[in-house]
Amino acid sequence: ELVQKFVTSAKVAKEAGFSGVQIHAAHGYLISQFLSPHDNRRTDKYGGSLENRMRFLKEIYLGMREELGKDFTIGIKINSTDFKEDGLTEEDSLKTIIELANLGLDFVEISGGTYERPAMMGATSKSTNQVFFAEYSKKLKQKIEIPVVVTGGIRSINAMNTLLNDNTTDFIGIARPLTI
């Protein structure tokens, strides 16, 4: 029933004229909690192994794809890690993204942390001057062919150009720099 509510929401977006949706599977919200072994203590088919923990997200994605067709863009925002002890690891995050990319996902936006443990409050990456998830994005881009969006800590045009020119990411997600 809950999966169908996500599918219906995406259908409403399409009917309203949007060309795509992004499934928010990051930051400790519901889908992120299913993915994280720290939060997901279920003993049914939605808990335990990574395959089981990603089942909810896969069912949402596949339901949307079936309902909306191949021409409707569907992406996800997902944590590289949730920075919790016994939480979602980079390895599990990579496996989840690869699985979804193989199912036809259109793009992935990389983020990290939860509102309990916000990654974007921490130190910035020295190798890219400001960006929080650049190293993870580089690893990911070697494993998938769909576009990758990096967000978090990107504050300057120089950093943006570096990320794009060295093939760290395909797109840059910015919010705070546009509002401050």
Where do the model's predicted regions map?
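Flavin-dependent oxidoreductase catalytic cores
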Residues: 1-180
